[in-house]
C-alpha cells in the first residue's frame, strides 16, 4: 500500500500526477490497476499491512505528507480536524465547514456530501467547535503521538459494553467479551463473543420440541425450537360414533364429525343449549342457517340465526298482543284514541295521520310517510344539496344516490412536477390544490412534492435530456432541475494528439480540457492542398483544421483575368470588373461584377438614356427594352433667354412628336434695363473699360436702398439671406465669409454636386443651413453628437444658384433697416405718450402718511431644514418690485415660525401694506405647493417680535439675512 492510500487515491508508478480513485466503502482498498502490476512476492505485499486510516494518523503526526482534499495544504497534529463517518477521510475543520455551508445553500434538501466518498449528511459542523474522534472533548489539545485523540476510552455504543479502544479514527473493533444467549424455546444456552451475538442469537436453535401450552390451554406446541409465538392450536377434535357424542352447533340443527381446536368457540353466556323436548347439549360453533321461531300466539313468528341458547318455539311472547301494543306504529298516538280496543294479536293495527318520523338507515333523515305498519323508506329518496367532487358546483340528489355527483369543469391545477396540468374533469384534488396555492409562497415549498395532494402527483416519465446532452432523465416527472448524468465510460478520454488524457472512469458529458500542444496534422505536415498547414493547437475531431491561407494565383469567375491574387482556401475568386456584356433584351450592358458565364442580370434596372427623337435630351424612364420611348412631353428643365441674354427663365422642355422644344419656339422680351445695360456696355467698350462680373446693376442697388427706407418688415427687403444668417455675420464676419467662399466655389465647380462639412457645433451648423437657403441648396444634418455635421447638395432641377448679393453687400442694407426700425419705434412711443401739466401750490408742511398696521409676513409651520437663505430665494424675486424695502428674514427659536418684514417696518406706510396684501395669497399658495410651510399671513412685526422673542431687540447672531447679502 502506497503513501497516497490514506487519501483514497493511488499514484502512478512513474511519479506522475494522475490518480485513480479507490473503493473505501468496505474498509479495504481495491486498485484498478492490472494484476500484473501487483507485487509478486509475499514480502513486498506484507511490507506494511497498516490500514489506510491508521496510515492517515501516522502521516498527520509527521506533518509533511497528509493533504486536505479541499485546500490541498499539508496537515499536522496542531490542525483542527474532521473525519467522514463512512470513509474516515480527514479534512481541515474550517475547510469542511465552508464546504458544507456552500453545499446546503445550493440544495433543496439542505444536504452536503463528503468530497471523497459522497456520503450524504445534513449536519453541518458547528463553528469553532471541533471535537476529538470520539466526540467527548471540544477543541482537543494538540497530540503529536495520536493527533486529535483525547486519550480517553472511546466507549461508543456499538454494543452493551461499548468500544474499549482509546479515542481513535476509523471503524470500531469487534467486541470480544463473552455473553450468554438462549435458544428460541429457552431450554438451552451457550457462551459466545459479543460481536457474534447479533447473528448467533437469531440462528441458535436447539432442535427440540417447543412443548409450551397453546391458547386452548389443553394442547402443547409440537414445533421444533422456533422464534415468535406458537400460533393457533392445530389439533383436530374428532367425535365418537355415538350420536350423543357428536359435535353440535348452537341451535342443534347441524353436527360435525371433527373440528379444529382453534375453531371452537364456547358460548359467552356459559349456558347450554336446549330444545323443545328438554334435550341439552353444548354448542361449539355457529352454523349458517336461520330458524323460523313462533311466538307464543303461534300466529306470528320471527327469524333467528344460530345463537346460544336458541329460542324455543312458543316461549317468547307475541309483540302484537293487545296487552303489549299500546300505540300506533309511529308511537305518537295511543290505540285507545284511534279505534275500539283490540282483542287479538292478529287484529289490524290502526294508524294515525301523523308523520312516521322514524330514523332511516341513512342516519340523516326520518321517514316522511304517514304512520304505517310496514318497513320505512328504503333506500332514502329525500333530496340533499351535495357538492361535486371538485366543490365547484352544487347538485340536488337523492340521499340514497350511490357516489358523489360530478360536474364538467376541467381541473387545470399544476401537478407536482410544475410542468404539466391536471386534465381531469371534476377532480377531487382541486380544493386541496387551491388551498395549497394560497398557503405556499416560498420556492422551496413549491418544489416539495410531499406537500402536494396525492391526486396531483405526476407519474409521467421525465424524459428530459440531461446536462450531458445524450441521455434522458429516467426519473418520474419532477420539479426543479434534473440530476446530473451518472453514466460513465471505462475507457480513457484522449485528445487526437494523445498528449491530454482524462483517465477512466470518464463521466458522461465530460469534455476534453484545452490541449495546448500542436495539432497532429501540423506535426505530420498533412494538408489536402499540399501547402504547409497553418500552425494551430490540438482540437477535437469534429472541428476541422483552419483553412489554408497561403497566397496563390487563381483565375477569376468571368475569365477576364487568369491570375488573381487570393488565399488558397478561397474558391469564389472575383476580379472586381463589371461584366459589360450587352444584354439581349435591351440596349444596355450587364452591370454585375465578375460572375460565372451565363449569369448576367435577368432584369435591367438602369434608366433608358436613349436620345429622344424631338430633342437632344435622354429618356428618363426606366429601361423598357428595345421598344420605342413613350411619346410624352419632355420634362427636362431648360433655360430660355431674352435676345441680349440678360433675362433668363427655367421651364420644362416640352418637346413631343407634334411639338418642338421650348428653347426653339420661345424667346423672352428685353426690357428697359436690357437697353440701359447695352448702352453701358457700348460706352465701356468705347472708353476701354473692362467688364466687371457683378450681376447687380447700380439701378437695382438704388432701388434696394429706397426699399430699405420704406420697408416695415424684413421680408419686404427681399434680401437673398435670412435674418438669422445676417445676424451671425455681424458677430463672426471672418468665419462667415469663409463659409460663403466655400459655397461659391462649390457653385462654380460644375463637376461637383455635393459637399460635406466637418463636424461643428449646433450654432455653426444652423448658420450653414440658413446660408444654403440663399443658394437654393439642399441641406441636412447627419450623424450623432459630437460628430454631427452638415451635408449640402445641388438641386437636380437647376434651382441652385449663387445669390445676387454677397453677405458683405447685404449686411449694410440690413444694418440700415435695423437702425430705421429703432428710430420708428422711438417716434411711435413718443407719439403715444401724453404729458399733462398741472399747476398746484406748494405747501410748506410735509403731508402726513398713515403708518401700516400689518407690516410683515408670518410664516407658520415651517418645514424642517429650511434656512433664511431658502426664504430669501422664495420671497426676493417677488418683493424687489414692491415698496417692501430691504426685506429681512428671521427664523424664530422654535424653528417652525419665521418673519419676513421690511427694514423700515416701524415707519412703513399703508402703501407698503397694500402691496403686501396683494402678494400674501400668492405666497400662501406657492408655499404649500413647494412644501415650504403650511401657511403665510400678514402680521404686525412689533407684536410678533415682542411676543415670541425674549427681548424685542434683534440680536447680531440671529439668522437674519438682508436682501443685499
From Swiss-Prot:
InterPro entries referenced in this protein's UniProt entry, alphabetically: NFX1_fam, R3H_dom, R3H_dom_sf, R3H_FAP1, Znf_NFX1, Znf_RING
Gene Ontology MF terms in the entry: DNA-binding transcription factor activity, RNA polymerase II-specific; RNA polymerase II transcription regulatory region sequence-specific DNA binding; zinc ion binding
An example Gene Ontology CC term for this record: nucleus
Superkingdom of source: Eukaryota
Residue runs in coiled coils: none
One GO BP annotation of this record: negative regulation of transcription by RNA polymerase II
R3H domain: residues covered: 733-796
Location(s), subcellular: Cytoplasm; Nucleus
Keyword set, alphabetical order: Cytoplasm, Metal-binding, Nucleus, Phosphoprotein, Repeat, Transcription, Transcription regulation, Zinc, Zinc-finger
SUPFAM superfamilies assigned: R3H domain, RING/U-box
SMART domains recorded: R3H, ZnF_NFX
ZnF region ranges: NF-X1-type: 159-177, 216-235, 362-382, 468-487, 586-606
Family classification: Belongs to the NFX1 family.
Complexes and interactors: Interacts with FPR1.
Other facts noted in the record for this chain: Present with 589 molecules/cell in log phase SD medium.
Name of this chain's protein: FKBP12-associated protein 1
Amino acid at each position: 500500500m502506497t503513501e497516497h492510500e490514506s487519501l483514497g487515491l493511488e499514484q502512478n508508478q512513474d511519479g506522475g500526477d494522475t490518480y485513480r480513485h479507490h473503493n473505501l466503502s468496505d474498509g479495504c482498498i481495491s486498485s484498478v490497476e492490472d494484476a500484473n502490476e501487483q507485487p509478486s512476492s509475499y514480502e513486498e505485499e506484507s511490507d506494511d499491512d497498516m490500514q489506510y486510516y491508521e496510515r492517515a494518523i501516522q502521516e498527520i503526526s509527521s506533518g509533511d505528507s497528509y493533504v486536505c482534499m479541499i485546500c490541498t495544504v499539508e496537515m499536522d497534529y496542531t490542525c483542527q480536524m474532521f473525519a467522514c463517518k463512512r470513509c474516515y477521510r480527514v479534512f481541515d475543520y474550517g475547510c469542511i465547514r465552508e464546504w458544507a455551508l456552500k453545499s446546503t445553500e445550493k440544495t433543496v434538501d439542505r444536504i452536503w456530501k463528503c468530497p471523497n466518498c459522497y456520503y450524504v449528511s445534513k449536519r453541518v459542523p458547528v463553528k469553532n467547535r471541533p471535537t476529538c474522534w470520539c466526540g467527548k472533548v471540544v477543541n482537543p489539545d494538540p497530540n503529536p503521538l495520536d493527533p486529535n485523540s483525547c486519550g480517553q476510552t472511546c466507549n461508543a455504543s456499538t454494543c452493551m459494553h461499548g468500544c474499549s479502544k482509546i479515542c481513535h479514527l476509523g471503524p470500531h473493533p469487534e467486541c470480544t467479551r463473552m455473553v450468554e444467549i438462549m435458544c428460541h424455546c429457552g431450554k438451552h444456552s451457550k457462551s459466545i463473543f459479543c460481536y457474534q451475538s447479533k447473528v448467533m442469537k437469531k440462528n441458535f436453535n436447539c432442535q427440540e420440541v417447543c412443548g409450551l401450552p397453546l391458547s386452548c390451554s389443553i394442547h402443547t406446541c409440537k414445533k421444533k425450537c422456533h422464534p415468535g409465538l406458537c400460533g393457533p392450536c392445530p389439533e383436530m377434535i374428532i367425535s365418537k360414533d355415538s350420536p350423543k357424542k357428536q359435535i353440535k352447533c348452537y341451535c342443534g340443527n347441524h353436527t360435525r364429525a371433527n373440528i379444529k381446536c382453534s375453531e371452537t368457540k364456547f358460548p359467552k353466556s356459559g349456558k347450554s343449549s336446549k330444545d323443545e323436548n328438554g334435550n341439552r347439549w353444548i354448542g361449539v360453533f355457529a352454523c349458517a342457517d336461520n330458524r323460523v321461531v313462533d311466538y307464543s300466539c303461534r300466529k306470528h313468528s320471527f327469524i333467528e340465526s344460530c345463537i346460544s341458547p336458541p329460542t324455543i318455539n312458543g316461549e317468547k311472547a307475541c309483540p302484537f298482543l293487545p296487552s303489549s301494543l299500546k300505540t300506533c306504529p309511529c308511537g305518537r298516538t295511543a290505540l285507545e284514541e284511534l279505534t275500539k280496543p283490540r282483542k287479538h294479536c292478529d287484529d289490524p293495527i290502526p294508524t294515525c295521520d301523523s308523520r312516521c318520523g322514524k330514523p332511516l338507515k341513512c342516519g340523516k333523515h326520518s321517514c316522511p310517510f304517514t304512520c304505517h305498519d310496514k318497513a320505512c323508506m328504503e333506500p332514502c329518496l329525500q333530496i340533499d344539496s351535495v357538492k361535486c367532487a371538485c366543490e365547484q358546483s352544487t347538485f340536488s340528489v337523492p340521499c340514497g344516490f350511490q357516489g358523489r355527483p360530478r360536474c364538467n369543469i376541467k381541473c387545470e391545477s399544476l401537478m407536482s412536477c410544475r410542468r404539466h396540468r391536471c386534465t381531469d374533469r371534476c377532480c377531487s384534488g382541486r380544493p386541496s390544490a387551491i388551498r395549497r396555492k394560497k398557503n405556499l409562497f416560498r420556492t422551496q415549498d413549491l418544489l416539495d412534492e410531499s406537500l402536494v395532494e396525492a391526486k396531483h402527483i405526476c407519474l409521467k416519465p421525465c424524459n428530459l435530456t440531461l446536462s450531458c446532452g445524450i441521455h434522458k432523465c429516467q426519473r418520474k416527472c419532477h420539479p426543479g432541475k434534473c440530476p446530473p448524468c451518472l453514466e460513465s465510460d471505462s475507457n480513457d478520454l484522449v485528445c487526437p494528439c494523445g498528449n491530454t488524457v482524462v483517465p477512466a472512469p470518464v463521466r458522461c458529458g465530460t469534455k476534453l480540457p484545452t490541449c495546448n500542444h500542436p495539432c497532429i496534422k501540423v506535426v505530420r505536415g498533412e494538408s489536402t492542398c499540399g501547402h504547409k498547414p497553418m500552425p494551430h493547437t490540438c482540437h477535437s475531431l469534429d472541428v476541422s483544421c483552419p483553412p489554408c491561407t497561403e497566397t496563390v494565383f487563381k483565375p477569376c469567375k468571368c475569365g477576364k483575368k487568369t491570375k488573381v491574387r487570393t488565399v488558397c482556401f478561397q474558391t469564389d475568386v472575383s476580379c472586381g470588373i463589371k461584366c459589360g456584356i450587352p444584354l439581349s433584351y435591351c440596349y444596355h450592358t450587364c452591370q454585375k461584377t465578375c460572375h460565372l458565364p451565363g449569369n448576367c442580370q435577368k432584369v435591367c434596372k438602369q434608366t433608358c438614356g436613349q436620345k429622344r427623337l424631338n430633342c437632344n435630351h435622354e429618356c428618363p424612364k426606366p429601361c423598357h427594352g428595345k421598344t420605342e420611348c413613350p411619346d410624352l412631353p419632355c420634362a427636362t428643365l431648360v433655360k430660355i433667354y431674352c435676345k441680349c441674354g440678360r433675362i433668363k427663365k427655367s421651364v420644362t422642355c416640352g418637346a413631343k412628336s407634334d411639338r418642338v422644344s421650348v428653347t426653339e419656339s420661345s424667346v423672352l422680351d428685353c426690357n428697359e434695363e436690357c437697353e440701359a445695360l447695352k448702352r453701358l456696355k457700348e460706352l465701356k467698350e468705347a472708353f476701354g473699360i473692362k467688364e466687371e462680373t457683378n450681376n447687380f446693376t447700380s439701378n437695382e442697388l438704388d432701388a434696394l436702398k429706397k426699399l430699405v427706407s420704406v420697408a416695415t418688415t424684413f421680408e419686404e427687403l427681399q434680401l437673398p439671406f435670412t435674418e438669422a444668417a445676417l445676424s451671425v455675420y455681424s458677430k463672426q464676419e471672418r468665419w462667415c465669409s469663409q463659409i460663403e467662399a466655400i459655397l461659391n466655389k462649390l457653385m462654380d465647380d460644375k463637376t461637383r454636386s455635393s459637399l460635406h462639412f466637418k463636424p461643428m457645433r449646433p450654432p455653426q451648423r444652423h448658420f450653414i443651413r440658413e446660408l444654403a437657403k440663399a443658394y437654393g441648396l439642399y441641406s441636412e444634418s447627419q450623424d450623432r453628437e459630437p460628430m454631427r455635421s452638415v451635408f449640402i447638395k445641388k438641386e437636380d432641377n437647376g434651382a441652385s444658384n449663387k445669390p445676387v448679393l454677397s453677405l458683405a453687400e447685404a449686411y449694410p442694407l440690413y444694418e440700415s433697416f435695423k437702425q430705421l426700425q429703432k428710430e420708428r419705434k422711438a417716434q411711435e412711443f413718443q407719439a403715444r405718450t401724453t404729458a399733462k401739466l398741472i399747476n398746484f401750490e406748494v405747501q410748506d408742511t410735509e403731508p402726513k402718511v398713515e403708518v401700516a398696521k400689518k407690516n410683515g409676513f408670518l410664516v407658520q409651520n415651517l418645514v424642517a431644514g429650511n434656512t433664511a437663505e431658502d426664504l430669501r430665494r422664495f420671497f426676493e424675486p417677488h418683493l424687489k418690485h414692491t415698496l417692501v424695502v430691504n426685506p429681512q428674514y428671521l427664523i424664530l427659536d422654535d424653528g417652525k415660525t419665521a418673519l419676513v418684514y421690511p427694514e423700515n417696518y416701524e415707519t412703513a406706510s399703508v402703501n407698503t401694506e397694500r402691496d403686501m396684501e396683494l402678494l400674501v395669497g400668492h405666497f400662501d399658495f406657492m408655499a404649500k405647493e413647494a412644501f415650504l410651510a403650511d401657511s403665510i399671513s400678514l402680521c404686525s412685526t412689533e407684536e410678533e417680535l415682542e411676543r415670541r422673542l425674549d427681548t424685542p431687540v434683534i440680536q447680531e447672531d440671529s439668522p437674519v439675512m438682508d436682501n443685499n447679502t
